[in-house]
From Swiss-Prot:
Catalyzes the conversion of glucosamine-6-phosphate to glucosamine-1-phosphate. This is Phosphoglucosamine mutase. GO terms for biological process: carbohydrate metabolic process; peptidoglycan biosynthetic process; UDP-N-acetylglucosamine biosynthetic process. Binds 1 Mg(2+) ion per subunit. GO terms for molecular function: magnesium ion binding; phosphoglucosamine mutase activity; phosphomannomutase activity. Its EC number is 5.4.2.10. Its cofactor is Mg(2+). Mg(2+) binds at residues 123, 262, 264, 266. It catalyses: alpha-D-glucosamine 1-phosphate = D-glucosamine 6-phosphate.
Length: 472
């Protein structure tokens, strides 16, 4: 660190940033996220960095660096530099990893003397969006109380912590090698994927370099798609939200399986050798059965969200397992897992948390363990999926509702609530409806699932029509 004088005047809370912080909570279900140049700017990132540094110093005993990583978006470097300057102004040293998956930032934060970590990414969002995710010293996502303290600082309502030094910025991309090695070590005696042909869709994102290198070092034959960091194409018609290219490649290459990551690689979905998608529900079921057989799943508990398929729930309960649902968002899953002492949880979308190895969702680690699980089983991933459970037909449709009040308070729409009640009456205990406002995009998400596909299609279409007629 370098000596500083009157450091407290280095970062000034400007009125327009204070106004942004006053309007709505900046932190959503997965950090701060928005359109770059509109909601998310370099001046805002700098002040978020400053107040993040202040809050982490107070929570972490006023010593230790902050680990910063980023995905491949064109705006990520700009925002990382702005945020790092704010951290330095708060008297915090910055260890900048450069391109690194979000779980890599969490891992390196936890396994170092860092007081926190920050990831610049908007996960699965389009290239024009970006975000800021903050982690505590233990590598878990920052709790709501500390997020609120950062927001209070941005509003000019927080007192800064006195200091007499500037922080320094150190570019240390080689630290990500420790994260890669930790994934390999977590496999133990099964760290050998020889004989498996695996297709990886890296989504032009944060895992573009690390994941193929890891799987090749484990002995797998790897076919890599979208495997360069490309800020113009990140998540565009590829990755975990667009599986078609991966499915086609698995079939064309005669591969055993494939894995698709999102832009920051904290989630993953799989494709089996028949080209079928394998979502987070199936991954949780298969990994849960393995952990239970190894007596590493306390209470046979799996924690997931309200989005999990009814077929998954009933199949897990049928084998004696405990099935716990939370609100959507991996931070809610993580909190419930910690409260219950559960070791496995996640989301249908591919955020998988295994507390034997990590405190956050980790797409690369999950993919490696699924591949090792298949290798050890002696049968194909397709066969394992067929032996697990039959999911209920499920449809998820998004309705774009720009008006935040209407979107977040959709329950006030009588026509929509009446339509939902009619659907629930019709399906009884053989189906369900879930309507919720997205925490990361201006979308109202409408999900219907039931034993009969015709019912699902009918009620999904009807509910979308009602929402579009009364909320837009």
């Amino acid at each position: 660190m370098v000596s500083a004088t009157r450091w407290e005047t280095a970062i000034e809370v400007t009125p327009w940033i204070a106004a942004i912080a006053e309007q709505v909570p900046l932190f959503g279900t997965d950090g701060i996220r928005g359109r770059v140049g509109e909601h998310l700017t370099a001046p805002l990132a700098q002040q978020v960095g400053f107040w993040t540094g202040q809050v982490l110093r107070q929570a972490g005993g006023d010593r230790g660096p902050v680990v910063v990583g980023q995905d491949s978006r064109n705006s990520s470097n700009m925002l990382a530099m702005a945020l790092s300057s704010g951290l330095a102004a708060a008297g915090v040293e910055v260890l900048h990893l450069g391109l690194c998956p979000t779980p890599g930032v969490a891992y390196l934060t936890h396994h170092s003397e860092a007081i926190g970590g920050v990831m610049i990414s908007a996960s699965h969002n389009p290239p024009g969006d970006n975000g800021i995710k903050v982690f505590g010293a233990d590598g878990s996502k920052l709790d709501r109380q500390l997020q609120a303290a950062i927001e209070a600082g941005l509003r000019g309502q927080q007192t800064s912590l006195p200091a007499t030094t500037w922080g320094q910025h150190y570019y240390q991309p080689q630290l990500a090698d420790h994260y890669q090695a930790a994934i390999a070590q977590s496999l133990g005696q099964r760290a050998n994927l020889q004989g498996l042909k695996i297709v990886l869709d890296l989504a032009w994102g944060a895992a573009a370099l690390l994941a193929p290198r890891l799987f090749r070092e484990l002995g797998a034959e790897v076919i890599a798609l979208h495997d360069l960091p490309d800020g113009n194409q990140i998540n565009v018609n590829c990755g975990s939200t667009h599986l078609a290219r991966l499915q086609a490649a698995v079939l064309e290459q005669g591969a055993d399986m494939g894995f698709a990551f999102d832009g920051d690689a904290d989630r993953v979905l799989a494709v089996d050798g028949r080209g079928r998608s394998v979502d987070g529900d199936h991954i949780l079921f298969l990994w849960g059965r393995e952990l239970e057989q190894q007596q590493q799943l306390p209470g046979q508990a799996i924690v997931t969200t309200v989005m999990a398929n009814l077929g998954f729930e009933r199949a897990w309960q049928a084998v004696g397992g405990e099935f716990v649902r939370t609100a959507v968002g991996d931070q809610y899953v993580q909190a419930e897992m910690q409260a219950r002492g559960a070791m496995l949880g996640g989301e249908q979308s591919g955020h998988i948390l295994c507390r034997h190895y990590a405190l956050t969702g980790d797409g690369t680690l999950t993919a490696a363990h699924v591949a090792a699980l298949v290798q050890a089983s002696g049968v194909s991933l397709a066969d394992l999926v067929d032996q697990s459970f039959r999911p209920y037909p499920q449809l998820l449709r998004n309705v774009r509702v720009e008006d935040r009040d209407r979107r977040c308070n959709w329950q006030n729409c009588a026509a929509l609530t009446q339509a939902i009640a009619a659907a629930e009456t019709d399906m009884g205990d053989r189906g369900r409806v879930l309507v919720r406002a997205s925490g990361t995009e201006p979308l109202l998400r409408i999900m219907v699932e039931a034993e009969e596909a015709q019912q699902v299609e009918h009620w999904t279409t009807h509910l979308v029509q009602v929402a579009e007629s009364h909320l837009l």
